Amino acid sequence: RLTDTFRVIGVDLRGHGGSDPPPSRAGLRYEPMAADVLAVLDALGIEEFSAVGESLGGGVSAVVDELRPGAMRRLVCCEGIAFDATAFPRGASPGEGGASGNFMADIARARRAVWPDREAVRARYAGRPPFDVVAPEALAGYLRWGFVDRPDGQVELACDPETEAAIFEVTSEPGGADRAFAHLAAMRGRVAVLRGEASYLPEPWFRAQADAAGTELRTIPGGHFFLQEDTARAEAIVRAELGR
């Protein structure tokens, strides 16, 4: 939908999609992930670009700008994981609590990794949050790229549960979401901050992002994955925010 105007590049961050997980937990911090993005852009000969970053991608995109000042024209940060943990009282920051101290990590570790086939995944996921509200083409894309084929004929999550759990933990530690948040002030005038109206993440988190970046907070109908809930709306958002 956007290729008439943009050269669209999608990067699988470490441990996601076709990218291998790093050998150590430290490799899941934002800086090495951002360095990977720059390595891809260098390999493609791209010197200037705009970014649309959702969730983890929003936070990592801010660090991409930090590592290479002047290369990123604009960032559309959608429910970005970029926050100053000290701004929230204990228990208010998403991720706290649970047996490991991070309930999102606990959920990730309990996630079923291996399924008989993609249709079995579809049957299970389509009626459960958050996939019960995403567009059919978004779910189809996740089934295609979010799972890998196994030699035994089954399919397995491309981002294994332990890697996903470690990412949730690392984002709340130094070098994670705080690193991205600290750079937002340097991006004033070049960032759009968007949140989902029904997001499970707190509105003050994103208002703090917008304040740091010197912009207005824009609230979009939908949840954390509002981009995937309505493809036509997502296209319109990107075109409007990037001015094309």
Task: Report residues per predicted region.
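Conserved hydrolase catalytic core segment
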Residues: 47-92
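Active-site loop/oxyanion-hole signature of alpha/beta-hydrolase fold enzymes
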Residues: 3, 9-52, 56, 88, ...
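Structural signature of beta-strand start/N-cap positions in the alpha/beta core
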Residues: 5-7, 47-50, 71-74, 190-192, ...
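Helix-rich cap/lid subdomain of alpha/beta-hydrolase
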Residues: 85-158, 172-174
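Catalytic histidine-centered segment of alpha/beta-hydrolase-like enzymes
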Residues: 222-231, 235
